[in-house]
Every structure is written in C-alpha cells, then in structure tokens.
Amino acid sequence: MPIGESYVGSAHPIAVQSMTNTSTLQTEASVEQICRIAAAGGDIVRLTAQGRAEAENLRNIVAAVRERGLHTAIVADVHFVAEIASISAQYVDKVRINPGNYRLSGGAFEALIAQCRERGVSLRVGVNHGSLAKRIFDEWGDTPEGMVASAMEFLRICQRERFDDVVVSMKSSNTRVMVHAYRLLVEAMEREAMTYPLHLGVTEAGNGIEGRVKSAVGIGALLADGIGDTIRVSLTEAPENEIPVARKIVDYFASREGEFHVEHPERYSPTAFVRRSCVQTPIIHSELSDDFVVMESTSANPTAELRARLLDTPAEQAVVVKRRYDDSELEDVALKAACDLGVLFLDGLADGIWIDAPALSDEQIKDLELMILQASRVRFSHTEYIACPSCGRTLYDIEQTLAQIKARTSHLRNLKIGIMGCIVNGPGEMADADYGYVGAAAGRITLYKGREVVERNIPQEEALEHLIALIKANGDWIEK
C-alpha cells in the first residue's frame, strides 16, 4: 500500500519511521527535525496534531519539507477529535487514529475514509494498550484480546468500505502483551480475509542500551515470525537516534535463512505464556550449574533453530540458550542478542541465557543478559523505567527528566517508574508501574501511585523531590 511516495507491505522492504518531538506549531523546528530524521534514513515521519491550529499548520510543514526536495512520508497523529483528523487529511500522506478515543458512531470514520480515498491518503489504525475505549476495557480488560477487538471494529469498517490503504499497530510498553496482541491480530485478520500491513513498536521503551534492548526483544520476536511491514524503535532521545537502531534490526533479519523441523509443535503456544520447564526464574550464564544443559546455536537463523530444539526437549530438562557475537560494539551485540534470544523467554521456552561476546567485559555481558531477561518479563533485576519518547504534546524536557530520575532512583531494583509526557497514553501505558510522573500542563507534573493520582499540578522543578518523598512515604525507598 502507498504512503505518499513510499510503499509498505507485501514484498516491499520494511520501512522505518520516527516521530517529531517539536511543537507542530513551530514550523521551522519541525521541518529541521524531519530533515534530520530523513537524513538518518527514516522513510516515514509522524507529527502530533492535537488541535485545529496544529492540524492546519501541517500544510506549512509539508510544503516546506517538499520545497527542500524531500519525499519522506508525513503522518498526522490524531487523538479524540474526528474534525482534527479531517483537517490533517487535507495535507499529509497518512493519518493515524487511535480506536481507543475515536468514536465509531455518527459516521465520522466512514467520512474520514471517503476523504482519504479521494486524496490518496492512507490510514493507520493505531491501538494503544494504555488507551482502550471504556466499552472494550469493560468487556475484555486491558488484555491483548481487548486490543484485537478494538482494532477489528475499525478494520471491519475499512473492509466494508473497500478501503485497503490501511496499516495497523498494536503497541504496548509490555513486550509480552505487545507480541501476543500482534499474533492474535494476525490470526483474527486471517479468519476474516484481511491482509493489512502491520506497523511494529514497543511504546515507552526508555533510552540507552535498555531502551534498545526492550524494543529489539518485542520487534525482533515478531520479525522472527515473519510479522511486520514497518517499525519504530521508540527512544527517549532525539528522534533521529531511533533510525539507525531500527535499520540495524531490519538489516539483521533480512539475511535469515534456514528451516528447522519440530517434532512436537503441540508444545508451542504463541499467544499464551506457558513455561516449558519447572524453572521459575531464568538464570544468566555465571549462575550455571549441573542442573542445566547448554544449547548453542551457530546457524544463520538462531531463533528458529533454538525454538525448534527447545520444543523437542523434555520439560524436565532445564536449558540455557547460548549464542556467540563477534561484534565490537555493545549496541550491536545487544540488538542481535535481544532479537535472537528474547522471544525464547517471552514464549517461556528457555531457562537461562549465555551471551558469548569476546569484545565485551564480563560486567557488560552480565548486565546485558539481565536486561534481556527483564525486557522479556521473566526476571526483574533493576529499576524499570517506562518512559515515552515524547512528541509535540510533551510540555517538558523528558529526556533530561528521565536522566535525573534515573540518577536518583536506579538503585531501587524492584520498582517500576513511569515517566510520561502527557495524559493521552501516559496513565494507561504505565498502569503496571509502581509510581508515575506525568506531564499535566506546561511546567506542571502529576504524580501517581499505581493507577491512582496522589498529587496534581506540582511545579516541575519540585516534582522529583515530591516523587522521592512519595516513594519514601510508601516504604519503597532504600538508601544507596
């Protein structure tokens, strides 16, 4: 399907994309950032359109980008208001709407489809785990099944209207939820003869190596299954930093070859987490004992090879999966290992991890193994930060704030802390966090304990101290 002058789906290469974090009212700043993303190799760039003024200014941004000779596809990100989607569709190549806050009643979605068809604009039905509609939540809860139900309502309308230029996404900050949601969606679409392209991404992955590992675990699990037509690696960093990471992941899967026979396919459940063995807490290689056997892959398709061998291994045998990486850079080893091995833990198949990387120190390998286990949701060993990458809706410097919060709280190993730019997806995406720090207005922060608001409209310069005081008041603080 076309997105401007780009194509996604079928045999077309996997497209990589990012999202600006400038205000969409700031034309020059937004254009400059789009140019940097394009220069880094981005195929698609998304901008937030939270109001009429932002939607109307997309005209100026797109015109300025085209004047510079760039043909990068431009996407409007719309929440809540159908009118804003309609305005945006006049100027951009694609409109993303969120089924969780877009009304189906009244024919607004059909009207948007008609407008997009007339202009040659594509749509993205972008489901977020953290912002399911109340009626969906009441019936399904915040589950992968609920995410699929939300998407299918809109896809059925697209199918009925014979509108095919649609991309679908099922994003979550929880890698297991995200992977199961996409797999369930593929099954649901196949049952109803739908073949819409899929956009992959893990929301609120964070920054640094941890953010890259978390994205690679989720995205890699699906690419290993042959699922995915576009991807975004969401990082709480400059948007252009996302593109080289996404390219590395895409390129890593482009050269995979090899099929492996499975004697016991009935042992595999792709849409439910079932432990293969009785080992409850997977180990890292320095914890290896005689109770485990080591299963090493040397093939060009390590995920498929190890998954096949694990499925044919008796449940009473605990297995540590091993892979050697000769790369010299930590990021390259981290991305490859997360892509190769993370899914084996997401699916409950492996019992331990061994990364053989001669260029890395023992401490780096240990940290990386623990990061992959944590990103795969099977062993938590350090503070987890659910941090959004920010966009034009963010009203504070989230990258700097994340660094400050990490500096003060990274020793609190059993906690999950959400750092969110705004309330659109923030409270929902960090629903399983112990504490939350969410932008409420310019220079103002709201603090959460679990899902409950405990303090509103705190001046940003005071918010970190208030967060620490809240953690202490609930008995979760440990002195360094």
Residues covered by each model-derived region:
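Alpha-helix-loop-beta-strand connector modules within alpha/beta enzyme cores
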Residues: 52-76, 112-121, 185-194, 255, ...
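Catalytic alpha/beta core domains of metabolic enzymes, predominantly
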Residues: 128, 136-273, 290-419
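Active-site mouth loops of central-metabolism enzymes
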Residues: 11-29, 48, 73-80, 100, ...
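Non-cysteine beta-strand/loop elements that form the S-adenosyl-L-methionine
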Residues: 95-98, 121-130, 198
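N-terminal amphipathic alpha-helix/helix-capping segment at the start of soluble metabolic enzymes
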Residues: 1-19, 117, 255-286, 403, ...
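Catalytic domains of carbohydrate-active enzymes, especially glycoside hydrolases
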Residues: 32-48, 91, 286-293
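Glycine-rich, proline-tolerant flexible connector loops at the mouths of alpha/beta enzymes
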Residues: 21, 39-65, 99-104, 166-175, ...
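Conserved, mostly hydrophobic/aromatic
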Residues: 16, 77, 125, 168, ...
